[in-house]
Amino acid sequence: MKYKPADKRYEKMKYNRCGRSGLLLPAVSLGLWHNFGDVDDFETGRAIVRRAFDLGVTHFDLANNYGPPPGSAEEHFGKILKHDLAPYRDELIISTKAGYLMWPGPYGEWGTRKDRKSVV
């Protein structure tokens, strides 16, 4: 069944300006550190994301080391985005972060250029 978000999803959520950027962020964001890895039930995570969006949450926080295993939360969110939220992509803010050890060796830590390019 195709997902259709709540028509009144923006009526109850409070939104605040982010500095002087003009960007509006919801008062509540959803971080995907827990409950979105390969060890978790995909459909449960999908339901959480969809319900959050129905309630006006437009900011989803990820990182390339979220899982377990590392990266699996981003993969799962990508599937949810593709199948459920793609028509609403312009309404979403998706953030990530850098600086964590991703792989052994001198280029896999602390946000090196090589590490950041591997994410893109």
Question: Predicted regions: what is each one?
Answer:
Residues 95-103:
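Substrate-binding cleft and catalytic face of glycoside hydrolase catalytic domains
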Residues 103-120:
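Glycine/proline-rich, positively charged
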